[in-house]
């Protein structure tokens, strides 16, 4: 099992690997990256990953407006999901460890579901053991719909123009 970790603390990925190897008696080879753009670059270089584990708090946000943060996060995850396909099985499951404030049924979960991210951990479910379970057995679309508590008619499956730059991205570039 080859996993790309994008969490803000290497101790987290080490703990996940140790727990997974204890639970499933399977070795994990991994790489740690520390920026959203580094995930994309790594996936462009190496298509052999089996799973991607991302901490929502990977990077500090230049803004404390939740809507702006959600748009930034969605744009990054959309770009990552576009690159997340491996040479063997197609799409690489993305496991997102959500922030404290995330709740089931929220608009961001509907958007993430729409781009095929079915493995977000929320609230009390954000544990090393649950990350290990999702690495071993990612959720199906049906399981994700039930876990996220969303209705099919809420989901907007839309293609995003890869050449367009969102207003949020422009503002973050200007601030930086």
Regions found by a protein language model. Name each.
Residues 1-173:
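Long, basic/Gly/Ser/Thr-rich N-terminal segments
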